[in-house]
Design a protein with these regions (language model features):
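Sec-dependent signal peptide recognition
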Residues: 2-8
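Bacterial Sec-dependent N-terminal signal peptides
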Residues: 10-42
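Structured interaction patches on ligand/partner-binding surfaces of diverse proteins
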Residues: 19, 103-129
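Short, ordered, surface-exposed loop/turn motifs in non-cytosolic proteins
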Residues: 46-63
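Solvent-exposed serine/threonine-rich low-complexity stretches and specific carbohydrate-binding patches
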Residues: 64-79, 113-116, 169
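Short Pro-Gly-centered beta-turn/loop motif in secreted/extracellular proteins
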Residues: 79-95
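Sequence/structural segment immediately N-terminal to covalent heme-attachment motifs in c-type
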Residues: 135-154
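Electron-transfer interface patches adjacent to heme c in soluble/periplasmic c-type cytochromes
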Residues: 148-157, 161, 165-243
Length: 243
């Protein structure tokens, strides 16, 4: 049976009996503003290392650091139905996002987002219903990286460069402990070893010329302000593989 948590976030007031051990950070104060209510059924929260967290956060355009962030506790059980509320969101906050953040409130991967500029003066609660999401590390990479920046060449429209498909349901099996078709003796992803993983090599500094296509440009174009965070997230996922 799903467990349901009602979690309210108010910038000036924190009601302890509702928030449990959920962490909150506020980077700026605000007068009365917009309210966003996230509804989601989440799994995989407890699989994250301590440096990352699953959060509902408000961002200003051009700033990769959240103005306000609410972090879900790592003890949240799988298949938990969560209702999470952000209140007092002023006009400087342009998006509300379900995201993977780090300890500095930096956005690493966006899992779902709503454009608050479409609700400039509303007094009604803005509802953000994202359905069921697996937020474990690989699933987050699938949703926030592969689906956004990779499947155009690896899986969509029947195109799979290097015979690699990175669409949902295919990516893990085609990456982990699978030999590269381009470089002999190298795994696409060597579970537990970033240094032996072609994916890590081609996305990190020095990987520009490993293959005929410069994959570092994928990160620089899609993740301008947080390339290093995405690289770290990929490496953390690889190092955590125990297959």
């Amino acid at each position: 049976m799903k467990k349901k948590y009602l979690l309210f976030f108010v910038l000036f007031l924190c009601v302890a009996c509702d928030s449990g051990d959920i962490e909150e950070h506020v980077a700026s104060s605000a007068n009365k503003g917009r309210i966003v209510k996230l509804t989601a059924t989440l799994s995989g929260i407890g699989t994250w290392e301590s440096g990352f967290a699953v959060s509902l956060a408000g961002f200003t355009t051009g700033d990769n650091y959240a103005q306000v962030v609410r972090t879900l506790p790592s003890t949240t059980p799988d298949n938990t139905e969560v209702e999470l509320v952000l209140s007092n969101l002023d006009a400087e906050i342009n998006t509300a996002e379900l995201a993977i953040t780090n300890r500095l409130r930096e956005r690493i991967i966006t899992l779902a987002s709503i454009n608050l500029d479409e609700y400039p003066e509303t007094s009604d609660t803005i509802r953000m219903d994202v359905g069921t999401i697996d937020v474990a590390p690989f699933s987050s990479l699938q949703r926030g990286l592969f689906n956004v920046a990779c499947i155009q060449c690896h899986g969509s429209n029947g195109r799979s460069a290097a015979g690699l498909t990175l669409t949902e349901g295919q990516a893990y099996a085609q990456l982990v402990n699978v030999p590269s078709t381009r470089i002999e003796g190298v795994m696409r992803v060597a579970g537990g070893d970033t240094h032996a993983s072609l994916l890590s090599q081609i996305l990190n500094e020095g990987g520009e010329a490993i293959l005929h296509y410069n994959h570092t440009e994928v990160l620089s174009s899609q993740f301008k302000e947080n390339q290093e965070g995405v690289r770290l997230l990929i490496d953390e996922w690889i190092n955590g593989i125990r297959d």
